[in-house]
Amino acid sequence: MRPIRVDERPKENIFIFYDFETQQCTPVKGDPTTRVHEPNLCVAQRVCTKCCDNVSIDEPCEHCGDHEFIFRTNPVCQLVELAIQSMPNFSHVFLIAHNAGGFDAQFILRYLIEEKKTQLPSLIMNGTKIITMRVGKLVFLDSLNYFHMPLSALPKSFGLKTALAKGSFPHLFNRPENQNYIGPMPPAADYSPDTMRPGERERFFAWYNELKNASYVFNFSNELITYCKNDVTILRQACVVFRKMFKDSGRVCPFSENTTIASACFQIFRKNFLKPNTIGIIPTGGYRWAHNQSKKAVSWLVWMEHSLNRRIIHAGRSREFKLPQNLLVDGYYETPDSAHVLQFHGCYWHGCLSCFTVNRDRVQGDGDTLNERLERTNAISQRIRSSGYTLTEIWECAYDRMIKTDLEMSAFVSDHPLVRAEPLNPRDAFFGGRTENMVTLYDVKDGEQIRYVDVCSLYPYICKYGKYTIYVGDECRALTGPENNISLSRVEGLVKCTVLPPQNLYHPVLPVRMHQRLLFGLCRSCCETMNQDACPHEDPAERVFSGTWVVDELRKAIACGYKILTVSEIWQYNITQYNRDTQKGGLFTGYINTFLKIKQEASGWPEGYADDEAAQERYITAFKTAEGVQLERGAVAKNPGLRSVAKLCLNSFWGKFGQRENLPQTEIVSTREKLMELLNSPEHEITGMLPVNNQVLYVNYTKTSDAVIPSNIANTVTAAYTTAQARLKLYTYLEPLGKRALYCDTDSVIYVTRKEPGEYEPPTGQLLGDLTDELSSYGEGSYIKSFISGGPKFYSFIVNTPGGAESEVCKVKGITLNYANSSLINYESIRSFIIGERENPVVLQFDSIRRTPFHQVVTRPEKKSCMPLSVKRRRDGEYGSLPYGYK
């Protein structure tokens, strides 16, 4: 992975911030309950790199002209025309809306396809959601991909100095007959108050009734424009602050150089902190079958060994053999009379004439054509022969025919250990966070309290203090095979192995994927069947797990009673880790320290420190001692915007390393030639085609496995190390808490404390990686008196505050607990499930804004069922649980 050189040449760009308001009155043909959104207003604010930092846009800019535009008729068409007119004299025009991918940009995509006033756009999509859309110099972005928060949260998060606040508007009142309405306040129902959260709904009615009682005159046309202008102003000012902070702190423009917050943070790292030759690029086939050697090639080579009764040097055993002529060959062996070379030609990579008969002069993804590949293959073969070697060659398609017709060969190859054992796939070691409910209900008894603690900035803590692999990995063969007192003490990297867990560990260590979930179990067979009884399996073969894990998790597992039975493959790496004493080392230390410093300074002085220089000096010294970061006294001041950006950069950085290499892609096709090119392409695997009209198709595809090349930005081993160390950090609390732990989620634990002598109590603090009290906002000494959980990310509890008041908290993944939903899903309703008073699910009915496959935005009625589902552990007693396989 290479650092990015900073391009000092200034690029002049235009930024257009916009928002559509829509009517939703026209029903979809054949479905009167589904209504189509049709834009009837667009407000756009245009700035350029010369003037974008100005808060006010009242005066025109000498470079980009007028700033604000209001389009009432054909708003989509007029916005596109504005963007096209803005292109001359500028490198690019970036059009940005909040939730553009799910809403605003959908209208633009349909317009561009139907009207054909520009070339067809190129898309990066996630399902029907548009991540980015490009049309020549026009680039459409979604600000929600940079800061994932509602528009109403932006003024506070970015410290906007104007008195901006996102107001309420009666969207359901936006109908054709009301466009010229002037009169009393519209009905409250048109504001959809039941979709607001309870507190927000209460504030809305206070505001609404105040205006209604004051006989406020509601001018729909003016109110619509004011509301939309306010939204665009909030978006523009937040994006400008966001951009300036990225430019100042990382020399990166997030909008012109990236499409998401993760890619922007990653670019800051590569521009400012990545050292050359530090992070390796992982070969597509891993390190065991080096140089992209295929499973088929190894299968043929082991068959040739068997047929010839010769031991052949090949990648299945070590590495491909390098001839003195500096040529890597697939297989090599010697006889008394001759030196033999064996070559397996993959049809795609070597340009097979039989398999690929068309488009042979089309440039493929790696920059050459099929004809060029064949010419290169023939030239190498001729060079091998002319050097005196006996050459045996086979094409992949010929091998495929052999394996189908030669039963002896098929049986031998399929049962050969070098073929049967799949190479280590680093993505198999990349697991997510640990989320489990150990109980479904717990009410405190006398002398007990339930506490809720959270690790402060868990992933930034791991990125700074955790260990990371560096340079290029290598396969370690010395420790593979059946277990013979194998020691992993010298191993750093990934290990593919078979492990036998203990049978009495309340919190298992190693994660496994089953039933589309991340489980922590003690018996494979019990996990597979979700056995609700004590483990009946006596044969270790029924209990073992085979998988790939980061070696640190395996070391902890061994310490907790796991046994390694067989090691299949090891990827060995060099390691770097930050040393607190020397304040050196670590892969991401410089990046994390930079934004940790910004965040800490932008948080301002602790309470009571503002006018106490001695206290300030102690604070700066303590932070330097703890984190190795020197705060600047003059820079310590509350700055919500700067703090928000720093926090985003700390939390949004590492995930880019885990990005998949072969993401689905969408191409808009309007010619028969282009369609045939995709259908006949050796690089593309068509996954779907959708006719838009008589002239246009959406074609979805992925790259074929042969065409996938190693990513130059992803490193799954780095991502796996991050999440593994995060799980181990959580385990440092789960292990001593034992059965007192009621619930955990990635970086947090809910547990029972009895304050008995010698009882373990997780320590809290304020620094990176310390535990913090999640209940402190209710007042010091607050605790949970009753906790219930219907499964991971499905819980509710009652907080008892120091003043004796009680507060209810409820969280259910996938459900917005607005006023309407909160009346159906709450502490009491969840408890009624847990204690057996209710069996039927809660059914929620609501209107939802969706996108059709044709990128039409609609509102349609939907239903969602909700009921507890605790399946990650087996039940134990009335409300407890044990891991699958516990005995």
Range-by-range predicted roles:
Residues 329-354:
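Active-site beta-strand-loop-beta-strand hairpin of nuclease catalytic cores
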Residues 322-330, 745:
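Catalytic centers of nucleases
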Residues 350-372:
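A solvent-exposed, charged loop/short amphipathic helix patch at secondary-structure junctions
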Residues 1-3, 396-401:
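Polybasic, low-complexity terminal segments and linkers that are predominantly intrinsically disordered
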Residues 1, 98, 349-350:
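Histidine-centered active-site/metal-ligand motif
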Residues 320-324, 400-401:
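Acidic-and-aromatic substrate-binding clefts and catalytic sites of carbohydrate-active enzymes
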Residues 11, 15-17, 26, 32-314, ...:
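Conserved acidic
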